[in-house]
Amino acid sequence: MSRWGKNIVVPLDSLCKEKENTNRPTVARSVGTVGKWGKMGFTSTRTYTLPAIHPMAAAAAAAAAAASPSQSPASTQDHDPNDLSVSVPEPPKPKKFFKSRNTAPPEVIAQIIQQLPHCGAGASPMRDHFSSAGAGAGGLTPTSGAQEAGGVKLKPGKGASSAERKRKSPKKKAATTSASTPSTPGAFYGASDRDGDGLSDPASEQPEQPSSASGKQKQKKPKEEKKLKPEAPPSRVLGRARKAVNYREVDEDERYPTPTKDLIIPKAGRQPAEVAATATLAAASSEAFISSTFGSPGSEPSLPPPTSAPSASASTSSQLPSASGSASNPPSASRTPEHPPIVLRISKGTSRLVSTDSEEPPSSSPAHQNQLNQLSVTEEEPAERSGDETVPASTPKITVKPLRPPTAADSVDGSSAAVGGASAGDSFEERKSQSLEPNEDEEEEEEEEDEEEEPPEINYCTVKISPDKPPKERLKLIIKTDVIRNAIAKAAAAAESRSEKKSRSKKHKHKQLLAAGSGAAPASGATPAEINSEFKTPSPHLALSEANSQQAQHTPSHLHQLHQLHPQRGSAVISPTTRSDHDFDSQSSVLGSISSKGNSTPQLLAQAVQEDSCVIRSRGSSVITSDLETSQHSSLVAPPSDIESRLESMMMTIDGAGTGAASAVPETPLQEDILAVLRGEVPRLNGNTDPEPTEEEDQQQQPKRATRGRGRKANNNVDVTPPATETRTRGRAKGADATTAAISPPTGKRNTRGTRGSRKAEQEVDMEVDETAMTTVPANEEQLEQATLPPRRGRNAAARANNNNLASVNNNINKIAANLSAKAEASRLAEGGVAGGAARSYGRKRKNQQVTQVLQQEPVPEEQETPDAEEEQPTPAKIPHTDHREHSPDHDPDPDPDELSNNSNNSSLQHDGSSSSPPPRDFKFKDKFKRTLTLDTQGAANAGAGGAAAAAPPESSGEQRGAVKLVISKKKGSIFKSRALVPSDQAEQATVAKRHLYKHSWDAALEANGGGTNSDASNASASGVGVAGAKDHLHHLAAGKSDGDFGDSPSSNNNGSSSACSSASTLRGDSPALGKISRLAGKQGVPATSTSSDAFDLDLEPIAGELDLERSAAGASAGGTGATTGGGGATGGGGPVRVDRKTKDYYPVVRNVKTAHQIQEIGEYQEMDDDVEYILDALQPHNPPATRCLSALQLAAKCMMPAFRMHVRAHGVVTKFFKALSDANKDLSLGLCTSAIMYILSQEGLNMDLDRDSLELMINLLEADGVGGSTETGHPDRAGYDRNKQKVRELCEEIKAQGKGTHLNVDSLTVGTLAMETLLSLTSKRAGEWFKEDLRKLGGLEHIIKTISDFCRPVIACDTEIDWQPTLLDNMQTVARCLRVLENVTQHNETNQRYMLTSGQGKAVETLCQLYRLCSRQIMLHPSDGGGSNKEHPGVAMRELLVPVLKVLINLTHTFNEAQPSLGAELLGQRGDVVETSFRLLLLSANYIPDQCVFELSILVLTLLINLCMHTVPNRAALMQAAAPAEYVADNPPAQGSVSALQALLEYFYKCEELARLVEKNTDAFLESNEKGKKKQEEVEETVNNLVQRAGHHMEHTLKGSYAAILVGNLIADNELYESVVRRQLRGNSFKEIIGVLEKYHTFMNLTSSLEAAFVAHMKSTKRIIDNFKKRDYIYEHSDEHDNPLPLNLETTAQVLAVGADASHAATSSTTVGSGSAPSSTSATGTTRAPRVYKTYSSHR
């Protein structure tokens, strides 16, 4: 909870999982429903099936679900059995939103990390950790081993999910943790480790269970996370994928085979410890562990080593998703978790994924332990089954697993695993439970009994019905406390026998683990076969597989050794279960279910529980529950984004460098390291494998750790695990000796967490140490308080403290504070005394995690960090921690540093995803690399240094931490920079705590952490997340670290161990080098967890790079582990671990947080989208008219907003609206509303979203007024119509107020007027060329022509003077707008032109001609030369109407084919009034209209005349015979009797030419006068302006004269008679002046016109006319030769002109008609030229 309290902000990232998986690895997914862009479910807790989950993730989820049956204890007390089945398992679907998360990125990252030097450095440690995890978890199918083996990266994702679920269902966390633990080694570890913090402490927590059994207990008791109903998921894969992936956002690996996530095996390991406490939990834990181990491809192979029974079953469940576990797959099937991992949410804000990974929960869930027990048939099945799990994996079994009383074996194992099992026991025991389930069951049962003694109240008997196959119909009988208590009583007895058996089996496993560690390193990584084959590359997978195989083979000896090494691991694994049963209601539901593993629900149940657990809200974490859960669910739903995965990987790498190592372990190098370590060749692995080697490693690493404070972490683990004295032993030797299994494994584990390689060694060592450390950390915290407490009791107390903190985090911050205080005291004791080391285990865990991260990443920094951590924590805890941690770091740095660089990054990542699939690793590495090249670069450089030397890796780690920080902040796809800022630990915390993010229990965390310096922020963050997550994290670190979950999500192991681990691994591990080292740090992050608080301080203060990386790696580790350690370390680590509040700056960082504007955009988009859907539904025809009218008005009102208009246009919704309203014309009221919508939408100058149906509706609405004719009298809803009309009027007035639609008369609104306004606003440019055709076909043209005719009839028919009323003027304005539409649709459209010309037998043309004449008369009757533009003036209205009339007439007379004269020219030419009216306008209009209007009108009239005579000979004759207007004759009395139109035209030409010359002369004079005197700049500018204006006037006159000349040229074309008539009217009988004007015009056009076809044709036509004039002049001048040459020339010229001009000018003519009226009426020969010129001019115009 303290994590939550402090880093509660982090959950935002989780909430924003869409961007950054890392931050919401576990929590993020469930917290942030942001997986999808616009959807962020912060408040609602949703169960998300994980359809998009990677198959591996799905398998892990299924396994988790199967293992999750531990959740079946009816969600302990508070959760309904039904609650667990929140999510229905669905087949794993590729995560759509964040595909990168799902697949390649992790592999890429893994590859990148592999390649990075830091990878090299970290790979070894990671590998060692994997080996240790594999060896330690091998028997148990430790997640890390499984991940190593299976390349369980995908499953680790589930692990994260499980961790998240744990968070979600803190109460179920215990039970769920068992379930969760199995789900994904990493995930389960993450879940279990978080549980481990909360659940891993189940042993101690169980005693505490009444108070709050675990950190989760807080949540668990108040509100046991509702156990997800064991809804039979289609497959374990589905459930696991579903929940695991989402929750395990950190676990990109789920989506992507990212080893880091799966590396969270320690969860599983821890769960075996739990299984000790609860056979069911242990079995589920083992199964889950196996499942988690094998949940991911890599993970499963790990299980096969323990393939005997648990491994196979866990592997199977895990394999279901990934089919990676070869041997395990069958068991997996049998225990296929059917529900996603259950996230137990701690009420304080820390939620644990009890079965975070539905896939992996089996490992820790009863199902998993059942599986393990069932699967123990293979190897440990007899032993494990001998516990509570008697049901064979193959046959459905109903196992009632009562909590087991601690047995001698358990206590034996518990001595090492109880001390370690108390703190590390959780995670280690869980893990051991998986690896050494018999022993661990005993240990766990001892722990559990100790814990049970306290919380017997929640003794849930999980009746786990495990069919031979993991049937989806798994029955999960959850017996509430009464039954469970009885079951617990039975479990006590059964636990003794089972614990003995499990002790055997765990010892067997442990031996196997040891064998795997020493000789089975290759096997540990994968199923024995897979591992062995993989072992060719000394891959941790091989190590795990070998370890598992050896565990299977050497169950007695190796199991014993492993039990010694991993007894804590197993105990821890079981311990969480045990504690879960009692301590965690939530966990009890899940882990309690697992605790009552004896009869724990089968994997199926566990799976179902886990799936449901997604929805489960931890009782205590109501605050976070809804939002965070929703986010979690959302996380489940949306796979973590690539960036998130990378961030997670990076964070895990940084935070869980060990995690990364574990993930990387799958790589051969890691396996080699692991093998070496397991064999004792590599101290790290040896630490895990052999108690002495562990001690050696511890001692070897101890100096480093001591210097770096990693030892502290180890010490914390060791302290708890062994006597404080041993724990205090700086070297792991003491801790390993005293608690070889307990202390050494925790150390290894912590180291593992610190670094992946280290994590490997620590997987074995830390497995034990984590169990021990987890047990010990809690025990340390409590043992520190009660130095003399039995390890388990200390663990129980510590677990209580941790679990209470976990549970209390959910349930009570006070509990957290108490637990933290207890842990702090324990830490102090460990620091100061025998238990001091143990207590330190917690406090150190964080520091050591950081230190370990740094250590393994950079041995020197680690040493430095270790001293810091040691300084923070007393030397005793510090030293043992350091020893253990350093032991792992020695292994990690020495063998694994290079491999870490190469493999730890790659391999650890790969291990996460799949031991057998480096590509998953590559994805992770890719993600890491993608997330931050900076981190990669730093990590690579650091890793290079670190890889070079053992010390170098720690340095690299330190550097990488800085880089990691950057990585986190600079997540590649991350929208939220803040995520990157969160340290890996915190990232994990954030991921875990994200659910509780909003609870921000700083104070509670601080109280709990009391003396935790770094623990303040880290503890608050890590206390909320750390107390709940601390134990869980310690356990998770132990289990996860040991199993590789640490490596996966050091931080995730804490909070959503797999989630945070994935987060760390993804975040930190994302950076290939950095990620690995970070992951190693994450593994070492177990100690680094304790160091993490320190590391946070260190990060905050000591080194920017180290600070970043350390904060990132250790931060993730410390944040997650450190959060755990902060919570646990604060509790256990006490004062030294406390983080200053200033560190809070880092903790509140929320990852995946959207910026304000993004939230706003998403909200606005969603709001508009919802509005559209709502309105669209209400507009459908099946609704009543009143409803449709109301919705239409609502839509119209919304369309007033530009943003909404843009939205509906952008998404093409407009046509959907009109389609729904297609029958609106049948109802007057609805039609009015519809036309209002159209009108409003048309007021923008944007293209209309029209289709044929919408246009048809618009045209139907034009005539809708008739339908409503009865409106006045008998409209059925007159009142409604009036109401709607008023609303429409208000909208229209608002539009007019905006300056639009000024011509609309709002007082006379009708359906037709609005529709017409809409139609008239359309143009082909806006609506498209199709508009011209459809408008004609749909009757729009006909309606427009009819409207014009109707409006003009009263005016045209009036013989007397017209009384222009406002209504008539309004009608004329409407006619003008209709004519503009006609002009638009007839331009360059011959079909529409012919339609208009033939419409109504020529009535349209007749109406136009009458209107033309009317305008001409009215202009002269009502002069408007005042320049005013008052539209109420009849002259102004008619003048404005005349322009569109002329343009329509010009279009109608345009000739498309010169060979075929224009039909319009013929029809209009037959009406004499057209030519007469045209000459009147041309010659007289200048006297009645403003000067600025004369030019346009003159050009249009000349263009019309040119079109009439260009190709139509009859029209030429009409023009030649036409007489000038009488008014013109009166003004210009003729010398002779009459004046012809031709004479008037020529005079007009000379007048224009003279005016042009005059203007030109004035301009020249003006220029000369200006040149005489010097002008100021202002005067020069004024002169230029004047010249421009004068030049404009000059060209206006020139253009008018030119058009007149073109008209003359067309008249005389091919007609000598007309030529002679014209020549007589010319000055000097010569065309020279005409030629001069035309040449000037031609030059002007040539310079200014574009190269469009119309202009080019016009230019050619003009040139022909000029040439014709010249020839005619030449012929005339040579009159003597006139007879012969002239006809020839004329003929030739005419032919040439005709051919060229007819062809090109025909097109030009009609084109020009629109612009000008010059060339149209030239005579025959000239006609060809003139028309073109005219056309061109017209077009040019």
Curated annotation (Swiss-Prot):
Residues 367-377, 586-604 have a biased composition (Polar residues). It holds the Pfam family WAPL. The modification Phosphoserine is found at residues 355, 888. One of its GO terms (cellular component) is chromatin. The modification Phosphothreonine is found at residue 258. The keyword Iron does not apply. GO terms for biological process: chromatin organization; chromosome segregation; meiotic cell cycle; sister chromatid cohesion. Residues 68-100, 119-277, 291-472, 490-612, 675-810, 823-963, 1038-1068, 1112-1141, 1708-1741 are annotated as: Disordered. Residues 1140-1648 form the WAPL domain. Residues 1117-1136 have a biased composition (Gly residues). Residues 175-185, 309-334, 408-426, 515-529, 553-568, 796-810, 849-859, 939-952, 1047-1065, 1708-1730 have a biased composition (Low complexity). InterPro entries: ARM-like, ARM-type_fold, WAPL, WAPL_C, WAPL_dom. Disruption phenotype: Flies exhibit brain cell metaphases where sister chromatids of all chromosomes are aligned parallel to each other instead of assuming the typical morphology, heterochromatin condensation or chromosome segregation are not affected. Residues 438-456, 860-873 have a biased composition (Acidic residues). Residues 165-174, 503-512 have a biased composition (Basic residues). The keyword Acetylation does not apply. Keywords: Chromosome partition, Meiosis, Phosphoprotein. GO terms for molecular function: cohesin unloader activity. Residues 880-894 have a biased composition (Basic and acidic residues). Belongs to the WAPL family. Has a role in female meiotic chromosome segregation in females; proximal heterochromatin is involved in chromosome pairing during female meiosis. Is a dominant suppressor of both white and Stubble position-effect variegation (PEV), while it is a weak enhancer of brown variegation. PANTHER family: WINGS APART-LIKE PROTEIN HOMOLOG. This is Protein wings apart-like. It comes from Drosophila melanogaster. The lineage of its organism: Eukaryota, Metazoa, Ecdysozoa, Arthropoda, Hexapoda.
